[in-house]
From Swiss-Prot:
Saimiriine herpesvirus 2 transforms T-lymphocytes, including human, to continuous growth in vitro. Two viral proteins, Tip and StpC, are essential for this function. The virus induced transforming activation is used as an important tool of T-cell biology, including HIV replication. Residues 19-70 have a biased composition (Pro residues). The keyword rRNA-binding does not apply. This is Saimiri transformation-associated protein. The chain crosses the membrane at residues 73-93.
């Protein structure tokens, strides 16, 4: 029985090999790779528009006091008034005495 040929696995006949067959179809796409690291930070954006104007400020402190009044001017005017009044009285008396003499 040992001399019986094994029909399951036939013996390959020797001879010239034929040309290679065409390449097979491409394989299926592989699974996606892991997520890459985050990219570098982008440049800063342009400046924003100017904001609205602020509310009006509080009122300022009161100003310094004014210069002192001039009481001397009042006294001078009073004295000048009295002198002019006396001169008018003198002139009136002179006129009256001149009229009485005539």
């Amino acid at each position: 029985m040992a001399s019986e040929p094994n029909l399951r696995y036939p013996i390959e006949e020797t001879g010239d090999r034929g040309p290679p067959g065409p390449p097979g179809p491409p394989g299926p796409q592989g699974p996606p790779g892991p997520q890459g690291p985050p990219g570098p930070q982008g440049p800063p954006g342009p400046p924003g528009p100017p904001g609205p104007p602020g509310p009006p400020g509080p009122p300022g402190p009161p100003g310094p006091p004014g210069p002192p009044g001039l009481p001397g001017l009042f006294v001078t005017n009073l004295l000048l008034g009295i002198i002019v009044l006396l001169l008018l009285i003198i002139v009136a008396l002179l006129l009256v005495s001149k009229l009485v003499v005539n």
